[in-house]
Amino acid sequence: MFKYDAFISYRHVHPDMEIAQDIQRLIEAFVVSKAVPAVPKRRDFLVFRDRDELASGELGEAIENALENSAFLIVVCSRRTPLSPWCRREVEYFREVRDPSNIIAVLLEGEPEESFPPELRDVRKLVRTPGGAVQERRDEFLAADVRPDRVRAEGFPGYEEVERDPRALRALRRKSAALLKRTEINRIMATILGVSYGDITQRQRERKMRRAMALVSVVALVLGVFATTVTAMWVKSMRSEEKANERNAA
């Protein structure tokens, strides 16, 4: 049993920092549907996200302890990630204490070969083919893709250049956050929970539908009570008016 469900590794640059914050917030607020197969009901998820850029290339005891006590490592990958000795060391250390299959990459810009740190690009695993032979293959870590269309487009200059235009940076950051919230958080949670993306997506959709139907029922009930009250008040008012007219006629 681990203290943290995930450790988030990221560059302390924009928008990597904001996306890391969004990932932490969405994981810790995630509610697992009771209908998701083979997953016990979870009340709380806990994520470790270091707020401070380390002053040296050494991780420090606190970071190493957090990595050792994390079930998964989430790496926010942008073109500047491979340039960070701290991100690379976090991936390297996690691989020393945990299986590489417990690493989740979130692609923020670029392609895996340019945005993944070398420690993610050079991982190999042994797999058994349908014929029974054992082969060494490159491990694939991409679990979530939060690149908006503009970022995917050929000729995108990169976030390091976009940072000079705060308005453009905010717009792209909002689009990435929307992608994360709409679909990609489910991919991340499917990996953490050990279930398929389809199971998570379908159950979350059903949960939202049930909540919407419950809300509609409450609104209908409130409107019904309101209509009944207004009708009763109108009938009472009409009767009072009739009695007043009868007294005046007498």
Identify the residue ranges that each predicted region occupies.
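Conserved TIR/SEFIR loop-to-helix hotspot centered on a Trp-containing motif
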Residues: 79-98
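Charged/polar helix/coil "stalk" or linker segments at domain boundaries
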Residues: 5, 13, 210-250
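Switch/connector loops and helix/strand junctions flanking conserved nucleotide-binding motifs
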Residues: 16-18, 56, 82-85, 111-123
